[in-house]
Structures are given as C-alpha cells and as structure tokens.
Amino acid sequence: MYAVVRTGGKQYKVSEGDFLKVEKLEGAVGDTVELSEVLMVGGDKVAIGTPLVPSASVVGKIVEQGKDKKILVFKSKRRKDSRKLNGHRQLRTILKIEKINA
C-alpha cells in the first residue's frame, strides 16, 4: 500500500517503512506526527482525492531534526566589482512512515 501526501508545499509518495526527508515539522525526536493531507491512496483499491481523500492519514515517527547542507548564493554585477556571497541551511525533519490509514 502507498499514499501520496502533501507537506511543506511538496508532494511525496510514501509506503510503510519508508524514510522521508521533509521541511521542518514541530516535535522532538521520537514523537509521532500525523500527516492528514493525503492526496491519493493506492494498493488493492485506489482512492484519488478531490483534492484530499477523506478520513485518510499517514502516521510517522520523527527520527531526526537537523539542517541540510549549506547552499551558497553568489550574486555579482558585471563590470562593477560588486559581489555578494550568502549561505543558507534549510531546516529539515526525517520521518519514518509507520502506518497508512485509508
């Protein structure tokens, strides 16, 4: 069985036992999180939401809270000797999908 969930403005296809790297979610390591924005549930019987599947949810456990690798943003103006270098590290959460409720 698999499901398509929406979190952090992105869509992910998940099944039970998968590890999922998403935008930061509130909670500590070991807490359970319920993702209620389920767009589709597949398996023996397919259910497609319009836009969401009613009474469907995905339960996951927070495995890790942290930051991604640093992304360097370099901006320059040609012929002006004007340069700017910024760095950014996005906060992220790693979930282990435990159960898909359909």
Curated annotation (Swiss-Prot):
It comes from the Bacteria. InterPro entries: bL21-like, bL21-like_sf, Ribosomal_bL21, Ribosomal_bL21_CS. One of its GO terms (molecular function) is rRNA binding. One of its GO terms (cellular component) is cytoplasm. One of its GO terms (biological process) is translation. The keyword Ribosomal protein applies. Keywords: Ribonucleoprotein, Ribosomal protein, RNA-binding, rRNA-binding. It holds the Pfam family Ribosomal_L21p. HAMAP family: Ribosomal_bL21. Part of the 50S ribosomal subunit. Contacts protein L20. This protein binds to 23S rRNA in the presence of protein L20. Belongs to the bacterial ribosomal protein bL21 family. This is Large ribosomal subunit protein bL21. It comes from Geotalea uraniireducens (strain Rf4) (Geobacter uraniireducens). The lineage of its organism: Bacteria, Pseudomonadati, Thermodesulfobacteriota, Desulfuromonadia, Geobacterales.
